[in-house]
A protein has these predicted regions:
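Conserved beta-strand-loop surface patch within small alpha/beta domains used
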Residues: 1-79, 88-142
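Short, well-ordered beta-to-alpha junction loops that form the rim of enzyme active sites
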Residues: 85
């Protein structure tokens, strides 16, 4: 079964980032390990939103995007997810999200709703498919 795996500390970090951004969309790169059915997040790289004070769009600044990929490479990880928030709506991909999901291939998008304070994950297969988020226990000796 397809799933995104995060620990509670990572979920809290993403939620705090979204809350700090208030009514503007927040964004982050999720780095980790991917096999055919699982995207296992090992590191969260919080980014700024280059769209500034936008409630409805996000763009990761090019220099932060590049740094995120370099960080993944240094740690022998890969991009396993793109996170952003919908401060004033539910956690469902917008038409803009769907367009950019097509450009990002087999990478889940994790969306946080500022209304419901919940997370949902989506992958583009033949169509947009919601996939479960599994919360794992954090082991300090991984």
């Amino acid at each position: 079964m397809k799933e995104v795996i995060l620990n509670q500390e990572q979920m809290d970090l993403l939620k705090d980032h979204a809350v700090k951004c208030g009514s503007n969309e927040s964004c982050a790169m999720l780095l980790g390990i991917h096999n055919e059915q699982q995207w296992n997040v090992k590191e969260v790289f919080l980014t700024r939103n280059a769209d500034g004070d936008s409630e409805i769009t996000f763009t990761i600044p090019p220099e932060e995007l590049l740094y995120g990929y370099q960080l993944a490479d240094e740690k022998h990880l890969e991009l396993v997810g793109i996170f952003h928030s919908h401060p004033n709506s539910i956690a469902v991909p917008s038409n803009t999200d769907k367009k950019f999901m097509k450009l990002n291939g087999d990478i889940p998008w994790i969306i946080f709703s500022g209304i419901n304070t919940d997370f949902k994950a989506y992958i583009l297969d033949e169509d947009i498919e919601e996939i479960p988020i599994k919360i794992k226990e954090r082991h300090f000796f991984q």
